[in-house]
Amino acid sequence: MIGIHCHNKPMTDYEPIPPPTNFHDQAEHSWTLPANWYTDSKVFEKEKKQIFYKNWWYVGTVRQLSKPGQIFTTTVVDQEVFVIRGEDNVLRAFYQENFRGTRGVKDIEDFNPSNFGLESVRVETLVGLVFVNLDANADALTDISESMVKDMRAYCPRLDDLVLSKSYELQTAANWKTLVDNNLESYHSAVAHPSLMGLLDYSTFEVWEDRFTTCHAMTNSNLDNPAYKLDSKDSVKRAIYSWLWPNTAFFIAPGPKNLGVFQMVPTGPESSLQRWEFYFENEQPTESEQAYLDWTINTLIPEDTALYENVQHGLRSQGYSQGRFVINRNRPEWSEHHVHQFQTLVRDAIMADC
């Protein structure tokens, strides 16, 4: 049984949430998180405070801040922050609420954040990408992602040199966890993604986890496949999909050097924004890279989006409250133990100060 229990504590600005029934630390014996955790506004408010305000959130690229004085603003759920490169060439981030002049910062002579009473936000970089964290006591991004990044670089060296080629966003009628759950299991691919099944050889499927990351890897099965055409000279022969807690995923697909970033942005208890960014060796995609983009945006993403929204609809059914995890560690392509890992992190975060 779950090892975290709520004790009598002073009331906070949100109601206590009861622990999920029959959720076990061992995946083989566990039920899933309850359906109302995917629909309840109280759970969503708790997630903002206990998950998104305390973990690493993708905000942009290092290239956007390549010169001293360059700045961009962003939002962590509902908290506005800005990131700036100082004259000392160091990246810094701050809450924006107490400073209305961020757009003109680069024009302010000898700009010093302390002169404006700005509260700092932690900022780190990862393979040329910028992340912020509102929690001053959180684990370092480099520490929690070290193993994942090592694996990503093994599949696609010199990731930091890739440049942004295409951005794509899509509003989705599903809780952010519905998106993560779907992306961490692969048994839906046989039915939902026929062209993906032609691109990748699922008999080569591998999955491995660290504390806050998961990686899936598969070999390309056919150069002339129904997804997009490949060349024998392409540098990436084996796909790797990596997930970083809580809501960022990275795709390295068969083909020329590439990186896809998929951020599952929560916008409400039953709504999310899919934020996709695609990186190649040059800003202008080649013909083969464009074919990959077209397939991903016009085929793969719509197929998954239909699943997200159908699952979310089912979670509102009065006939469903919880399910059981499908666990088969000898057949990882059919197993949900990595989904259980994610849901355990959610449970622990929500129950942390109940």
Per-range role (PLM):
Residues 3-5, 64-136, 142-150:
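Rieske [2Fe-2S] iron-sulfur-binding domain
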Residues 6-10, 84-90, 121-125, 129-354:
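C-terminal catalytic domain of Rieske-type non-heme iron oxygenases
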Residues 6-95, 122-123:
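N-terminal pre-ligand scaffold of iron-sulfur
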Residues 15-23, 102, 149-152, 235-236:
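Short, flexible segments with low predicted structural confidence
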Residues 16-20, 34, 61, 116, ...:
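Alpha-helix initiation/capping motif
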Residues 29, 33, 107, 192, ...:
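Glycine-rich, flexible loop/turn motifs
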Residues 34-36, 61, 112, 140, ...:
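Short, solvent-exposed coil/turn linker segments
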Residues 53-66, 101-107, 243-247:
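Short Pro/Gly-enriched beta-strand edge/turn motifs at strand-loop
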